[in-house]
């Protein structure tokens, strides 16, 4: 029958839902292959292929299906079926996240009535990363000489989970909340599991002494050496190599080994993607990457892109794609919301002002002195 004018004012009741990542993939990482299961939804009801065929056989207008009236539009229905074919099968985790939150295709997909939802495994995994208290406790390293606060234990669990999943991680806690001890705990666990592993820490020159002191204090069994100044030869027998940003720029030999973990302290040092230092560091191959910074965004959103280009390359697209995306942020506030949803599983940030983090700290006091 003909569609009446009052019906045309209603929002289309036909759309596609693509369920991604229902089960855990066999291999983990951003290139993990997830299942993609599209289904056609009419007024909240999923249709079988047989029922879809029945819809196509009906005349355009209103049709009676599953005890309700639905709009039959052959052209739109055919478009939806073509979209179903496009999504049916598998998709990489990186593409799944991009399509869910930040893809340039999202406007097209929405117009065609495509809704992407996370399946059970993907939903639970991202939920754990956004709230580390949901992650199952990882056993504390046997020889760690430190007592972790509850939020630090959550951070330790989170770093281990990120490593298990093959994701890069940004530990962005406020200064003073113990980013260093959380990372040392993670490294001590890695050392405990495999003493043949090799990790590279790149830190400001002013922090070399502090890292050495903290490792000696909290993980005295861990073998490490400092690569700085005249000491410019890698020690193959050491678990950890600690060097500076300046040395990382000069020593191309750091790029000749695939490190088990690459860690940047004060990672805002790579905020400018165009510098030689940033480009050199991003060339260092590694299985896992950690960025430590209290300021993941210092000046503008391009800082965030450079950080994620190091941590999880391709997640935020190319520099040009991301620049075009950020232009929409001021005009459309929902775009910044999408971006936050996109990066939040990979950034762990706790604040000293949050009493749920440290309840025994006194309130912050600010004193203004006029000079």
Please provide the spans of the model-predicted regions.
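A structural signal for short hydrophobic/aromatic patches embedded in well-ordered alpha helices
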Residues: 55, 80, 155-156, 339
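ASCE P-loop NTPase motor core, strongest for the SF2 helicase catalytic module
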Residues: 115-334, 340-361, 365-367, 371
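Accessory nucleic-acid engagement/destabilization modules that flank
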Residues: 1-128
């Amino acid at each position: 029958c003909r569609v009446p004018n009052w019906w045309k004012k209603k929002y289309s009741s036909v759309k596609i839902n693509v369920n991604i990542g229902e089960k855990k993939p066999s291999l983990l990482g951003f290139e993990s292959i997830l299942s993609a299961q599209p289904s056609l939804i009419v007024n909240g009801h999923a249709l079988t292929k047989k029922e879809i065929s029945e819809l196509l056989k009906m005349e355009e207008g209103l049709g009676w299906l599953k005890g309700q009236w639905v709009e039959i539009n052959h052209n739109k229905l055919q478009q939806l079926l073509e979209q179903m074919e496009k999504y049916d099968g598998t998709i990489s985790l990186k593409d799944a996240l991009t399509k869910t939150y930040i893809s340039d295709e999202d406007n097209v997909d929405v117009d065609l009535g495509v809704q992407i939802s996370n399946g059970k495994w993907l939903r639970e995994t991202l939920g754990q990363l956004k709230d580390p208290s949901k992650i199952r406790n990882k056993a504390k390293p046997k020889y760690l000489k430190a007592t972790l606060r509850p939020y630090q234990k959550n951070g330790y669990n989170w770093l281990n989970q990120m490593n298990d999943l093959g994701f890069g991680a940004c530990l962005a806690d406020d200064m003073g909340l113990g980013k260093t001890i959380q990372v040392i705990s993670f490294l001590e666990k890695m050392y405990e599991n495999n003493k043949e592993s090799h990790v590279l820490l790149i830190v400001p020159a002013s922090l070399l002494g502090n890292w050495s002191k903290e490792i000696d204090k909290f993980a005295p069994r861990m073998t490490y050496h400092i690569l700085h100044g005249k000491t410019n030869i890698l020690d193959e027998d050491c678990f950890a190599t600690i060097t500076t940003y300046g040395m990382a720029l000069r020593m191309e030999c750091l790029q000749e080994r695939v490190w088990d973990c690459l860690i940047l302290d004060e990672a805002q040092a790579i905020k400018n993607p165009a510098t030689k230092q940033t480009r050199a560091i991003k060339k260092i191959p590694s299985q896992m990457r950690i960025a430590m910074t209290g300021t993941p965004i210092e000046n503008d959103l391009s800082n965030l892109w450079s950080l994620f280009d190091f941590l999880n390359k391709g997640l935020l697209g190319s520099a040009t794609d991301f620049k075009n995306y950020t232009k929409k942020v001021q005009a459309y506030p929902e775009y910044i919301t999408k971006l936050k949803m996109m990066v939040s599983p990979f950034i762990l940030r706790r604040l000293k002002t949050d009493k749920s983090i440290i309840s025994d700290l006194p309130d912050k006091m600010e004193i203004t002195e006029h000079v």
